Amino acid sequence: MKEFKVTTGPLPGSEKIYVEGERFPFLRVPMRRIRMSDTILENGEREKNEDVVVYDTSGPYTDTSYEVNLHRGVPKIREQWIEDRGDTVRLEGLSSEYGRIRQSDASLEKLRYEHVCTRPRAAKDGCATQLYYARQGIVTPEMEFVAIRENQLIDQVRTRYRAEEGEPLGAVIPRKITPEFVRDEIAAGRAILPANINHPESEPMIIGRNFLVKINANIGNSPISSTIEEEVEKAVWAIRWGADTVMDLSTGDHIHETREWIIRNSPVPIGTVPLYQTLEKVQGDVTKLNWEIFRDTLIEQAEQGVDYFTIHAGLRWHHVPLTLRRLTGIVSRGGSIIANWCTTHKRESFIYEHFEEICQILARYDVAISLGDGLRPGCIHDANDAAQIAELKTLGELTEIAWKYNVQTIIEGPGHVPMHKIRENMEIQLEACHGAPFYTLGPLVSDVASGYDHITSAIGAAQIGWFGTAMLCYVTQKEHLGLPNREDVREGVVTYRLAAHAADLAKGHPTAYWRDYMMSKARFEFRWKDQFHLSLDPEKAIQFHDATLPDEGHKEAHFCSMCGEHFCSMRANKNFRKLLNEEAVSK
């Protein structure tokens, strides 16, 4: 195996900081502080600007004091918290037959992560989930961690400014999020805190309508492209630019080993679609899929530390004929596999039939379930059709079953939906699925943007994020065309960070407005470096500016290359403001 190389170090103008807990003083919650320069007043005096603290998903990779060693993995920050709860036990060995086979295969030695845990954790009494704790009225360290993280020290801001209230459209956005608020949202099923007890490296985060909108980045090899090294680098690269979670959708060689490397080096929750690996185990023959192999795959991945599973349990046998009226049929990979199986065997899927047993497995490890939308529309023509809505209603029924077993649950959504149908989609989901968090792929608002689908989907993502979606699954410019590379991942993540931020602004999140306010102030005052550093992609902002004005002195100039020195509106504003102020003083 080649030597791993990942991108490390802070973003321009930023530094990693840690905030301690109050209830749990041992907590060290990571954030990114963007350093602001002084404002130069008309009289030449300097006025200090407050630094801006923002949410940070990058883990230890941007901490200059941390020595990166991918063969060792990132720190297991939750290990002691899990141990102290006393409700889990170390198993004598791997429970999955496939996991044991891979572990004993000497030919995989060079590919295998060196420090594989062969004694994973499981709940002593069958359940060790954050939902269970929340329902018992318990505030866990993970819950306080999340509360501190969501607030981004906004209560310490001293600058007086008029904050925009936003229009939350039914969401409840507190000025300050408390650990108790986090607990209550999880207990109500309106939010999840994905945190497998076998992924102690993960930094707690929350997905819910009443919190900051999150984004997911998909990575994964295919049978014809990519290596373990490339996928680990993609994961680290995605979180550097703001991915809150990462889904490993590998379908190629060494899925088990690739996933182990990713999890051990990931400070964010990792999701998978277990059905993909199950299909690989039967050499791609859908007819040979069965409950026993799928069950073993769930246990295998849960004991590795996967934090949430996409499971297409809501696609019923009688739903399949509804897709015959569609223009593009079933476009979900998981959905097409299940539909094929149901049609071949002329019965309900083994996933639907064994759903309660699935929940029992997930509760043992605190794996959240993302109920997959196997019948999501694959084109504008099919949006909000009978097949999509029928499955969504089934997902609502399954949500209640999952909650019965204290399994944290989110609902997956479309897809391709024109703008005028997006709000309706959100409203149907909220009612059918009892307020469980919605997790959508876009949606794409048009079908004609090949090569630009990150843009057409971000338009829909910003809207549905405002309407109530809790997490947005990114779409890259390679969507419908090919497997995304490293730069496609960056472009997709930053584009979706923008969509999520726009939704947060519309909903009235105070932290979102504060960052925009400080950007506008820096722009009006021609503090170019501060503008770069406050951007979602500082490196690209610097690159674009320097392409036409490369000299260091131009970063102090009161104009840019768009308008030039004599046509800059902000420069003109400053001039006539000065005149008006002088006139006011003279009067």
Swiss-Prot record:
[4Fe-4S] cluster binds at residues 560, 563, 568. It holds the Pfam family ThiC_Rad_SAM. Substrate binds at residues 218, 247, 276, 312, 332-334, 373-376, 412, 439. One of its GO terms (molecular function) is carbon-carbon lyase activity. Zn(2+) binds at residues 416, 480. Its cofactor is [4Fe-4S] cluster. InterPro entries: ThiC (IPR037509), ThiC-associated_dom (IPR025747), ThiC/Bza_core_dom (IPR038521), ThiC/BzaA/B (IPR002817). Its EC number is 4.1.99.17. Binds 1 [4Fe-4S] cluster per subunit. The cluster is coordinated with 3 cysteines and an exchangeable S-adenosyl-L-methionine. Keywords: 4Fe-4S, Iron, Iron-sulfur, Lyase, Metal-binding, S-adenosyl-L-methionine, Thiamine biosynthesis, Zinc. Catalyzes the synthesis of the hydroxymethylpyrimidine phosphate (HMP-P) moiety of thiamine from aminoimidazole ribotide (AIR) in a radical S-adenosyl-L-methionine (SAM)-dependent reaction. HAMAP family: ThiC. Belongs to the ThiC family. This is Phosphomethylpyrimidine synthase.
